[in-house]
Curated annotation (Swiss-Prot):
Catalytic activity: GTP + H2O = GDP + phosphate + H(+)
Domain of life per record: Bacteria
Gene giving rise to this polypeptide: tuf1
Subcellular localization(s) per the UniProt record: Cytoplasm
Chain's role: GTP hydrolase that promotes the GTP-dependent binding of aminoacyl-tRNA to the A-site of ribosomes during protein biosynthesis.
Protein name: Elongation factor Tu
NCBIfam families attached to this UniProt entry: EF-Tu, PRK00049.1, PRK12735.1, PRK12736.1, small_GTP
Species name: Clostridium beijerinckii (strain ATCC 51743 / NCIMB 8052)
InterPro entries on file: EF-Tu_GTP-bd, EF-Tu_GTPase, EFTu-like_2, EFTU_2, G_TR_CS, P-loop_NTPase, Small_GTP-bd, T_Tr_GTP-bd_dom
Record's GO cellular component terms: cytosol
Similarity remark: Belongs to the TRAFAC class translation factor GTPase superfamily. Classic translation factor GTPase family. EF-Tu/EF-1A subfamily.
Domain annotation tr-type G: ranges: 10-206
Keywords carried by this UniProt record: Cytoplasm, Elongation factor, GTP-binding, Hydrolase, Magnesium, Metal-binding, Nucleotide-binding, Protein biosynthesis
Amino acid sequence: MAKAKYERSKPHVNIGTIGHVDHGKTTLTAAITTVLANKGFAEAFNYADIDKAPEEKERGITINTAHVEYQTENRHYAHVDCPGHADYVKNMITGAAQMDGAILVVSAADGPMPQTREHILLGSRVGIQYIVVFLNKADMVDDPELLELVEMEVRELLSEYDFPGDDIPVITGSALKALENPTDEEAIKPIMDLMEAVDSYIPTPERATDKPFLMPIEDVFTITGRGTVATGRVEAGVLHVGDEVEIVGLTEEKKKVVVTGIEMFRKLLDEAQAGDNIGALLRGVQRTDIERGQVLSKPNSVHPHTKFVGQVYVLKKEEGGRHTPFFDGYRPQFYFRTTDVTGSIKLPDGMEMVMPGDHIDMNVELITPIAMDEGLRFAIREGGRTVGSGVVTKIVE
């Protein structure tokens, strides 16, 4: 058992493979686990295990995702790989599988293809900041100049979408050769180089407890003679008794209040942190000043907004979504954290309508402000059922 305990002491990072169909994402994922398993750092998965990924339901959307885990000397990784292109699109937009960084797989024999571009664009929209490139199938390219050309193309493509194309690590190799010869030092060198690049280039993510305090309010009640209690699950940061916080959302104004008590499982605490379900006792707040759908947050860390741009995946009929397209000016409900707010949608210029199964950029104007930042996920609902899933990519006002 001692070993299992040691695993947890390594920093944890979530990554995934992205890139065009048949460029070797799944083969690379299998090769990483097989090569590292040989060094005692993973359980080996073969191609078929990963390829027949189970269907998962995330907010009613069907996504096929394979999860594998492995370690390097320095870190523990959770790695996602999706069999189909549509699965990637859904995964990235819904945030079903969080990625702190990604390995972009490009076939050296083919160069960047349409989905290579699309995955880079989506990654930049949904907040993946770090990409490491694996130029795969290098054994199929005889001319070293051709390899250099493909590498240049990939770097230019990354720069086009605001990634630091010149600085991104690019590793060249053959995932299949490594998978077939996991003990041959020469065959596995590219895999080891890739893991070293991932280790050093993709930073350890900031832990939720290090971020500014934020708690979406789920319920509010009054304790006679003591004040108003707001309950919810702390999403980020740490809260101490005596801290001043702001109530944000549903009104233009923010209201500052002091937390005079924190209760969890009927016990009083001095502090609460990310992941805790708590009741926060607030001084000098009327029951009518605060409601579900607002958030408690560290002063000036988050602001209420009504206009934003979102990247949205529209559910297919088979996923319980709409059976028909919607048009410019469509007014559904937008579900943020704990509440629905009506908003109107403006489609990109030249776009007449959106079909179920599409993913698009849309401009949204809500009728009441919501505490939001870029990267916040939301659902689009109509009569209580989810018809779309999205992420805020830009705050307008």
